[in-house]
């Protein structure tokens, strides 16, 4: 009894060691596989690779339970990417994986070759494949079409088998030795890349590893109507395949070396159609181009639209996509500069009709957006949103440097200039520059003396416009006094000087009643009464032409 116990213990230890050796071999094969080299070269594994690593992880690979749990969390994060994906996107990834898992083995592998991003794309691919196969009758292929038909069927099956082997998942035998016994054993399809615009990719199929084709196993997967054929029709089609099987021959070693250098399936999106060919024995079959390729692409887009209910329209200039063709047509006007909608009042043109409607409110005075709190109305919805923040106290725009918050993004941009020191608004008549356009306008009045001078803020965004604007304004070089012919560079200086001739002293001390021509003189005088530097309010005289009132700290 003890001997049997020792033997069982020895067998268990040997079994555990064998399992560990298998796991080590599997990990080494995984690390040395071309896909691992590819992912290490790219810097991070793709979604499919990350999912496989998460599913293939086993407890013996870790040093302990804590390390195993930590490793699982790391692999799961690499697969689902919670830092980039939302909860809905993560849920879609899990549903997509389960959807692919429940598909039949051959069909599942073919769908994985297409790299779908959602379950709706899987549905579109399956419905498209089923319609394509339903359009092909199960008849004996002619000499001209036999090779092409046989290649298309074999490509569908072998692409699935090649995908499963590359993903390191258990592969069920796709081809069996039980039927088509007369088919030569050297028959194989060599991987040559893209075989048509429908995204089907052929992969290598060796009869030594996978056996021969069995119609009874493959037909139900391709389309449900194959199961409705009687035995005579199945045998007839089988004989046709046997007759044309000789055309599927392997390429020589030199050609296989060249084939391995061809781009992968996902790179064919950027490859020109005329550069892609499908080799069949010694014949070269060009991929459909031009109108034929556009027709196939249109069928696939129609299938995707019928399955998902959506269709994307892409701009060739910038790649932006739209759900409706009208949106794409409107977007193209940005590149062409076309503005078909013109205002009848002022002649200003716009790209879209909605922009014209909003502009017309300037002329009509319409303000359809009303605040429910205070009843104030606005012509733009964005203005109403900004106004409502005054009631709610919301300040969504925060400065990264000091943490100060603002209700509008433009206020945050102006505030940033305090930290950066940027002063984009420069006076064209003197070296002074300002952070705000309003400060520039206020400063320009010291040169022109025009109190009503105003230019809208967006107008000053371009420095060239500022320069061209001031070139068109005729301003005197100096301001001359009519009494003594003294000249001044600023009109404010001239006004202060004229008080010398008129004897006007508009700034009066409230304590003793003494008057002064300048507010600075009054401030100095009031310090004699207070004996310290305090806040002083300077009030001009009643009949003063200047009318200056200021508060100094």
UniProtKB/Swiss-Prot annotation:
Disordered, as annotated region: 28-49
Molecular functions (GO terms): chromatin binding; DNA binding; DNA-binding transcription factor activity; sequence-specific DNA binding; zinc ion binding
Pfam families, per database record: KRAB (PF01352), SCAN (PF02023), zf-C2H2 (PF00096)
Keywords: Activator, Autophagy, Cytoplasm, DNA-binding, Isopeptide bond, Metal-binding, Nucleus, Phosphoprotein, Repeat, Repressor, Transcription, Transcription regulation, Ubl conjugation, Zinc, Zinc-finger
Keyword field contains Protein biosynthesis: no
KRAB domain mapped to chain residues: 213-273
Coiled-coil annotated residue ranges, if any: none
Modified positions (Phosphoserine) in chain numbering: 33, 44, 223
Biological process annotations from GO: autophagy; lysosome organization; negative regulation of autophagy; negative regulation of cellular senescence; negative regulation of DNA-templated transcription; positive regulation of DNA-templated transcription
Position(s), cross-link Glycyl lysine isopeptide (Lys-Gly) (interchain with G-Cter in SUMO2): 176
Domain of life where this protein originates: Eukaryota
Phosphothreonine modification, residue list: 136, 206, 448
Entries under InterPro entries matching the protein: KRAB, KRAB_dom_sf, SCAN_dom, SCAN_sf, Znf_C2H2_sf, Znf_C2H2_type
Sequence similarity: Belongs to the krueppel C2H2-type zinc-finger protein family.
Function: Transcriptional factor that binds to the consensus sequence 5'-[GT][AG][AGT]GGGG-3' and acts as a repressor of autophagy. Specifically represses expression of genes involved in autophagy and lysosome biogenesis/function such as MAP1LC3B, ULK1 or WIPI2. Associates with chromatin at the ITGB4 and VEGF promoters.
UniProt protein name: Zinc finger protein with KRAB and SCAN domains 3
């Amino acid at each position: 009894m003890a001997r049997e116990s020792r033997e069982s213990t020895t067998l268990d230890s040997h079994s555990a060691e064998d399992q560990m050796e298998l796991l080590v071999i599997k990990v080494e094969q995984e690390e040395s596989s071309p896909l691992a080299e590819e992912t290490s070269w790219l810097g991070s594994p793709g979604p499919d690779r990350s999912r496989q690593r998460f599913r293939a992880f086993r407890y013996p690979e870790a040093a302990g339970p804590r390390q195993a749990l930590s490793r699982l969390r790391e692999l799961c994060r690499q697969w689902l990417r919670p830092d980039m994906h939302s909860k809905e996107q993560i849920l879609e990834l899990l549903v997509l994986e389960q959807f692919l898992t429940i598909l039949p083995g051959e069909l599942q592998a073919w769908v994985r070759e297409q790299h779908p991003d959602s379950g709706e794309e899987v549905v579109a691919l399956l419905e498209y494949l089923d319609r394509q196969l339903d359009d092909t009758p199960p008849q004996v292929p002619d000499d001209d079409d036999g090779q092409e038909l046989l290649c298309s069927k074999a490509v569908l099956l072998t692409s699935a088998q090649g995908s499963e082997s590359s993903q390191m998942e258990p592969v069920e035998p796709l081809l069996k030795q039980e039927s088509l016994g007369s088919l030569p054993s050297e028959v194989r399809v060599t991987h040559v890349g893209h075989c048509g615009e429908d995204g089907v990719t052929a992969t290598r199929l060796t009869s030594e590893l996978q056996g021969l084709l069995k119609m009874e196993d493959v037909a139900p997967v391709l389309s449900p109507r194959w199961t409705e054929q009687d035995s005579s029709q199945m045998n007839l089609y089988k004989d046709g395949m046997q007759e044309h099987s000789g055309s599927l021959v392997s390429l020589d070693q030199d050609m296989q070396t060249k084939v391995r250098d061809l781009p992968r399936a996902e790179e064919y999106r950027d490859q020109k159609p005329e550069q892609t060919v499908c080799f069949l024995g010694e014949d070269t079959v060009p991929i459909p181009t031009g109108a034929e390729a556009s027709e196939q692409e249109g069928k696939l887009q129609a299938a995707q639209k019928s399955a998902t209910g959506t269709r994307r329209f892409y701009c060739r200039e910038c790649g932006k996509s739209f759900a409706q063709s009208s949106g794409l047509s409107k977007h193209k006007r940005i590149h062409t500069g076309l503005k078909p909608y013109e205002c009848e009042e002022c002649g200003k043109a716009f790209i879209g009709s909605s922009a014209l409607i909003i502009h017309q409110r300037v002329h009509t005075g319409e303000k359809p957006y009303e605040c429910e709190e205070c009843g104030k109305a606005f012509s733009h919805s964005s203005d109403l949103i900004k106004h409502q923040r005054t009631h709610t106290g919301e300040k969504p725009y925060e400065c990264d440097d000091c943490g100060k918050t603002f209700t509008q993004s433009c206020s945050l941009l102006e505030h940033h200039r305090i930290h950066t020191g940027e002063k984009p608004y420069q006076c064209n008549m003197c070296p002074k520059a300002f952070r705000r356009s309003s400060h520039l306008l206020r400063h320009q009045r010291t040169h022109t003396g025009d109190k009503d001078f105003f230019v809208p803020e967006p107008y000053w965004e371009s420095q060239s416009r500022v320069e061209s604007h001031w070139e068109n304004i005729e301003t005197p070089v100096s301001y001359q006094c009519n009494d003594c012919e003294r000249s001044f560079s600023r009109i404010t200086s001239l006004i202060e000087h004229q008080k010398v001739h008129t004897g006007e002293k508009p700034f009066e001390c409230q304590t003793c009643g003494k008057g002064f021509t300048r507010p600075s003189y009054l401030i100095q005088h009031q310090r004699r009464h207070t004996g310290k530097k305090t806040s002083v309010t300077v009030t001009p005289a009643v009949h003063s032409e200047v009318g200056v009132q200021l508060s100094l700290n």
